[in-house]
């Protein structure tokens, strides 16, 4: 923890943004599915009851904020968690609440 008010404000803003994204249960479910594997939209859709269009919109938002990244193989796009801190946060949440 920092004592510098400017740094504290910046970090608090960053963390609040992450928590805001995680406050949507579908996005949280997506990240939980991606915690151990990279998956396609179709594979995610087998775990999460949501239209493929809505699922893609959530993935786009997570990607826009740097929480997931993609890897393309031919026409197939694989999603994975981009930030190791997000994986750590998910592990803590899972340990405490699941």
What annotation goes with each model-predicted range?
Residues 58:
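Residues within the DNA-recognition helix of helix-turn-helix
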Residues 13-53, 73, 77-84:
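N-terminal helix-turn-helix DNA-binding core of bacterial DNA-binding proteins
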């Amino acid at each position: 923890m920092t004592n510098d008010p400017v740094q504290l404000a910046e970090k608090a803003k960053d963390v609040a943004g992450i928590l805001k994204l995680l406050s949507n249960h579908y996005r949280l479910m997506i990240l939980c599915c991606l915690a151990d594997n990279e998956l396609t939209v179709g594979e995610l859709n087998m775990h999460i009851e949501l239209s493929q269009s809505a699922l893609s919109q959530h993935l786009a938002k997570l990607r826009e904020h740097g929480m997931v990244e993609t890897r393309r193989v031919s026409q197939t796009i694989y999603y994975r968690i981009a930030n190791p801190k997000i994986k750590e946060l998910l592990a803590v949440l899972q340990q405490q609440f699941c």
